[in-house]
């Protein structure tokens, strides 16, 4: 087991990933889906507040950064003229389902059910960007998904209380970010595979 303070590595990793994503927004190569980024900033912050109240500490650093980074990107999407993705009905529908799951998460007094609804809320928030990454990989930048993943991996090595509410969100974010990165790099990955065959 690693020392708990190593979770602090997620702060510089998250900041670098965010800065590189914003740089790509200025270049026009990253256009965030505002529904995803708004809900990605909201759900982790609520989760941090709840888990902090239940005694979690160091394991919350990467989760906090999972909310802080999208919040910064969301703010910049209103500043940078070309820095956002045009929303469609599907995006709003996913947003509504995510908000419903967030509300259920907040009103349910059973920690494991609340945790499930938190993941469902984040999943619905992620779907529009996952679809966008796979259909339009040129509209996404992988840094904001790759670098924070390292912080979540470290987080799994510092957890002392192996309750699902402690480690589940980090595992979920690793899976979701991997799907996003594969979508963004799909043409490069598949092209290399086909040349090797």
Where do the protein language model's features map onto the residues?
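Alpha-helical membrane-protein topology signature
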Residues: 1-197
